[in-house]
């Protein structure tokens, strides 16, 4: 904001000096700590939103978790992520031509609609829960368009019929190619022969640009890349069950912005150490910071299950 003195209404005893302009700028106040109630619900659904938290500004941004299916990387490489908060899964077909992929091909493909807790579910159908972009379901988008396979994609609302019975005609088929410095996406239901087409430009403000296959709209998949540290949502995670670690979709997953450079450490404490008396020395002596998305994940709580007597937020 710029202020400039142009004239004076009082002339006697006053005059305009040599400094006639002043610039006033505002910057965010860096938070020293506080409390936030995450607005993950919308009244109709318990975990309707993905909640992005900016710790330095003590602020949050909500994005509807079902507002997008695929995210397109805005960095130097060409990569696509699945929206695990919408329980999105994907598997490659055997073909590279959109029109050549039919419902018959979908019937021969692995059943990506299988429940995450079933024996038929494969972790290969989702992206790496640690956030490693070299381990996504789509893989690197090749420079040669003819090398990119058509993928079958399904999210929570289009995996099966409403009664849970199988219906692979609900799935989408998607082919992604490079388009200059951005992406070109061909998509439609598996029975479509003519694709819908959308071009997506990289936006350096964001880590990813989202695309809704239902509406065809390009949307904000996340908060701005430098304006969030952690995200709370329903999402894919590795949870410790009675039988051991299980990869599944779960509530209350906390994800770190590893793509944006955030590093996270877990520091175990004794009963005498609380949030209020936790010190910097506790971090430097015990912390092992990792640039992984799932360092927190679901580890901050114990899920309710048969045989568990201490379900809830952990105290250590």
Protein language model regions, located:
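Surface-exposed, beta-sheet-biased, low-hydrophobicity segments with strongly acidic/polar composition
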Residues: 13-316
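Short, aromatic- and glycine-rich surface loops/edge beta-strands on solvent-exposed regions
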Residues: 3-7
């Amino acid at each position: 904001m710029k202020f400039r003195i142009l004239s004076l209404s009082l002339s006697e005893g006053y005059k305009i000096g040599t400094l006639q302009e002043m610039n006033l700028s505002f910057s965010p106040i860096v938070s020293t700590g506080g409390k936030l109630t995450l607005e993950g619900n919308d009244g109709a659904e318990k975990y309707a939103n993905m909640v992005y938290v900016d710790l330095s500004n003590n602020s949050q941004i909500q994005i509807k978790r079902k507002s997008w299916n695929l995210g397109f990387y805005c960095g130097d490489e060409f990569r696509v992520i699945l929206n695990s908060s919408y329980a999105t899964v994907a598997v490659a077909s055997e073909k590279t031509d959109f029109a050549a992929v039919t419902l018959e091909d979908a019937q021969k493909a692995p059943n990506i609609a299988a429940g995450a807790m079933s024996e038929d579910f494969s972790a290969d159908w989702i992206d790496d829960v640690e956030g490693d972009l070299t381990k996504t379901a789509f893989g690197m988008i090749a420079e040669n368009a003819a090398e990119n396979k058509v993928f079958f994609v399904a999210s929570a609302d289009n995996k099966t019929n409403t009664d849970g019975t199988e219906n692979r005609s609900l799935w989408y088929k998607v082919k992604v190619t490079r388009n200059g410095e951005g992406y070109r996406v061909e998509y439609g239901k598996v029975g479509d022969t003519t694709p819908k087409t959308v071009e997506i430009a990289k936006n350096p403000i964001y880590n990813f640009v989202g695309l809704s296959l239902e509406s065809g709209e390009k949307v904000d998949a996340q908060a701005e890349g430098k304006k969030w540290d952690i995200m709370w949502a329903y999402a894919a995670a590795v949870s410790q069950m009675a039988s051991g670690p299980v990869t599944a979709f779960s509530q209350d997953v906390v994800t770190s912005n590893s793509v944006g450079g955030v590093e996270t450490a877990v520091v175990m404490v004794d009963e005498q150490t609380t949030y209020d008396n936790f010190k910097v020395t506790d971090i430097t002596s015990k912390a092992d910071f990792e640039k992984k998305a799932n360092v927190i994940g679901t580890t901050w709580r114990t899920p309710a299950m048969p045989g568990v007597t201490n379900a809830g937020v952990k105290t250590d």
